[in-house]
Amino acid sequence: MMNYATIVTILLLLLSGQSVNSQESPPELTPVTPIAIEQGYLEGRGLTRVDPSEFDGENVTRDEDFTSDSYTHAFYTGKIFVAVYEAGPGRVYIDGALYDEFVHILEGRLILTPDSGDAVEFKQGESLVVPQGYKGYWYMPEKYRELIVINTDYAKAEGGP
């Protein structure tokens, strides 16, 4: 005859969806390891040229005088996207940023002029957050490089990874 503790254990296992006599081994756990942010990329070495069409559909319009190439290196893509981005002088208009973006300026200056206010300048070594929905100009008056962290929830909402 089973005792009360055995009956309760069996009921709990049944309610949790596990087999009482399960011979299944536990699922394999994928090891989680840190990802190094390599200094060379932060300094602009080894970056890959960006195809300008990658910005299609991101509510970004380049000014006609923005002809310089852009370069990048992605460190990580998951719930966040972490990358270095570099461009020459230029200005773009953002008509409603699709995602929250953390920016740390590695080289150059960034001048943001929101539709709703005055220009704000950020310099090398400074950090900022551009919230989802931002509308305004993004101006890089000289060679510019940044470390960015982007929330990738927007891509999932649009059927992305």
Model region roles, listed by residue range:
Residues 1-6:
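Positively charged n-region of N-terminal signal peptides that target proteins for export
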Residues 117-132:
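Short acidic-glycine-tyrosine-enriched beta hairpin
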Residues 7-16:
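Bacterial N-terminal signal peptides
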Residues 82, 94, 112, 146-149:
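Short hydrophobic/aromatic-rich beta-strand segments that constitute the beta-sheet cores
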Residues 97-112:
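Short, conserved beta-strand element in jelly-roll/cupin
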Residues 22-79:
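A short, N-terminal "cap"/entry segment at the start of jelly-roll beta-barrel domains
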Residues 78-97, 132:
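Conserved short histidine dyad/triad with adjacent acidic residue
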Residues 132-156:
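Ligand-binding loop in jelly-roll beta-barrel domains
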